[in-house]
Swiss-Prot record:
<dbReference type="GO" id="GO:0019843">
    <property type="term" value="F:rRNA binding"/>
</dbReference>
<keyword id="KW-0699">rRNA-binding</keyword>
<dbReference type="InterPro" id="IPR047873">
    <property type="entry name" value="Ribosomal_uL16"/>
</dbReference>
<dbReference type="GO" id="GO:0006412">
    <property type="term" value="P:translation"/>
</dbReference>
<dbReference type="InterPro" id="IPR000114">
    <property type="entry name" value="Ribosomal_uL16_bact-type"/>
</dbReference>
<keyword id="KW-0694">RNA-binding</keyword>
<dbReference type="InterPro" id="IPR020798">
    <property type="entry name" value="Ribosomal_uL16_CS"/>
</dbReference>
<dbReference type="GO" id="GO:0003735">
    <property type="term" value="F:structural constituent of ribosome"/>
</dbReference>
<dbReference type="Pfam" id="PF00252">
    <property type="entry name" value="Ribosomal_L16"/>
</dbReference>
<protein>
    <recommendedName>
        <fullName>Large ribosomal subunit protein uL16</fullName>
    </recommendedName>
</protein>
<comment type="subunit">
    <text>Part of the 50S ribosomal subunit.</text>
</comment>
<keyword id="KW-0689">Ribosomal protein</keyword>
<comment type="similarity">
    <text>Belongs to the universal ribosomal protein uL16 family.</text>
</comment>
<keyword id="KW-0687">Ribonucleoprotein</keyword>
<keyword id="KW-0820">tRNA-binding</keyword>
<comment type="function">
    <text>Binds 23S rRNA and is also seen to make contacts with the A and possibly P site tRNAs.</text>
</comment>
<dbReference type="InterPro" id="IPR016180">
    <property type="entry name" value="Ribosomal_uL16_dom"/>
</dbReference>
């Protein structure tokens, strides 16, 4: 699973998820991509589940690029603990994804296979997604 090797601060602020993604809105490496149409946090487990769903459907054919990385930690307190007494312990890692960001890219397979593989991957993610193609240059 994807986790940072080392971080400066273990506990981060949650931050805001306003507006569209600034960069990474076009398909740059592969031929086809999966673009987020809503914003959300995507955990490292969800990214891994989507990757497995894609590669299994493509039967090891083609190439997959993961263009998001879970660099933000999130914390949680144990169930049954009252409010206060500081921030909870680090629970996991998330990738903040804004709308418009291309999260996964695929190349080396036909459009039908890529479309179905990315559709299966989108069912593993908490954001609404759409299939996008690389624009002709």
């Amino acid at each position: 699973m994807l986790v940072p090797k080392r971080v400066k601060h273990r506990r981060e602020f949650r931050g805001k998820m306003r507006g569209e993604a600034k960069g990474g809105k076009e398909v740059s490496f592969g031929e086809y991509g999966l673009q987020a149409t809503t914003s959300s946090w995507i955990t490292n487990r969800q990214i891994e589940a989507a990757r497995i769903a894609m590669t299994r459907y493509m039967k090891r054919g083609g190439k997959v690029w993961i263009k998001i990385f879970p660099h933000k930690s999130y914390t949680a307190k144990a169930i049954g603990v009252r409010m206060g007494s500081g921030k909870g312990a680090p629970e996991g890692w998330v990738a903040p994804v804004k709308r418009g960001k291309v999260m996964f890219e695929v190349a080396g397979v036909s459009e039908e296979i890529a479309r179905e593989a990315l559709r299966l991957a989108s069912h593993k993610l908490p954001v609404k997604c759409k299939f996008v193609k690389r624009e002709a240059e």
